Amino acid sequence: MKELKDHVVVITYGPSSEASVTASPVSQQTPSLFAYSVTPSASRFSSRRASVHVIGLVLRFITMVLCFVSALSLAVNVQRPSKRHLTQNSSSFASYPELLYCFGVAVIGFVYTSLQTFKGVCDITHRGVLISEPLSDYISFIFDQVICYLLVSSSSVAIAWIQHINEDAIKTLRNNSIVSVSMSFSAFLVLTLSGLLSGYKLCKRFMW
């Protein structure tokens, strides 16, 4: 009677163990096929994000150079006027609020884009050590809009000043102001593209 029980136990547990052995290869194949199917799409997504990051970095570098040239074209004409010749027709841009505003905005744009360029290079080399990606997307989108507004407003103010100034005594300053406004408006156009790219990255973050 005892041997019959042992024999019955062997018969009942034998098929279940065999079934578990045959079922295990099927369960192991499913994740491997899924993993191979996901890898190409993930690599394409990461390469697309890397290309967007590089394009944004190039746009900010171009904006930085344009803002630097805009500020430099006004700064090279600085002369320290004497107290006796401190009149309205001074050849220094600091004597005119419109040009001083344009110079200040160009300096602000240069500092901002320099920091963004430095951060972009650090993100490529050190994989986002300075600021996290979500916070960086928000900061870039907001400050791109602010700097764009400042650039276009300073260009408009400087253009109005150039149109009303015809004195020969400040002809050099007027020519330098034209160069500064041209560079400032070009920086506005390039930074607008960078702002659109920042908005695209922010929308993609909301979608994902």
UniProtKB/Swiss-Prot annotation:
Glycosylation: residue positions: N89, N175
Record keywords: Cell membrane, Glycoprotein, Membrane, Transmembrane, Transmembrane helix
Keyword Metal-binding appears in the UniProt entry: no
Gene Ontology, cellular component aspect: plasma membrane
Membrane topology, as annotated: Multi-pass membrane protein
TM helices/strands, residue ranges: 54-74, 93-113, 142-162, 177-197
Subcellular location: Cell membrane
InterPro entries: CASP_dom
Taxonomy, superkingdom: Eukaryota
Cytoplasmic side: 1-53, 114-141, 198-208
Ranges facing Extracellular side: 75-92, 163-176
Subunit annotation: Homodimer and heterodimers.
Protein family membership: Belongs to the Casparian strip membrane proteins (CASP) family.
Protein name: CASP-like protein 4A4
